[in-house]
Amino acid sequence: MPANPFNGFTEYGIGIGLRIPHYRHIFEHKPVVDWFEIISENFLVDGGRPLAVLDQILAQYRVVQHGVSMYFGSTEKLNHDHLRRIKTLVKRTKTPWLTDHLCWGSVDGTYSHDLLPMPYTFEAARVTARKVREARDFLELPIAVENVSSYAEFHVSQMTEWEFLNEVVEQADCGILLDVNNIYVSSQNHDFDPFEYLNSVPAGRVAQIHIAGHSKFEKYILDTHDHPVIDPVWKLYDHAIRRVGPTATLLEWDDRIPSFDEVHQEARKAGKFLPQIEEALV
């Protein structure tokens, strides 16, 4: 993976999300996995089984933290109690970088527990970038923001989603967690060219890539993480890594979770694209 300041100058390969149904298999069979991604909020506790399991994983594998509730796009201040808990976990996992979503989801201390799309305005970009910088400085760790899937748009938007992403990461001087499936989902819902999106992303800021499956519901495509990756998403992934180089890639599978072996096998499909890129870079 091309080393850059947004992934802590580390080289990771292909990972999968650490999920409860797979704990027993992992501990009994000790499969060869490049790294696991954990949802930070699942481990913000003072003790008990979650941390005991995590410590067992950390003894054998590398881990990267992925958050779901920073809500950089919300107008209220960052929750510093939450940040302190995140920082405690960071010290435990030694994650080389931390990711969360480019979205909003809270108002006046009330949380939606959802990843809501942003209005693509210059003011929203300014507020969001300031909060990303604040979190990065507090955590003393590189941060990468993830593009979310969306099913609605704001009339007040002043730019495209990819222009907004670029505006935020430039102002925040942060990395990108490039979710290729989310780009595909949103492109189908909002009728834009996903390759134009990928071609606009600043390659030097991509710290990590997500791939996943999705579902169709009536006229919308939903980012459900409950199916294998479809061919059009693999084609986008291939295009993405040709632009950014071999990059830490994570398969998300969060619902209707099959066996560990099936998830692992699906994730390893990403590997067939990497040798081509590595040869091209020689």
Regions found by a protein language model. Give the residues of each.
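N-terminal pre-domain/capping segments
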Residues: 1-88
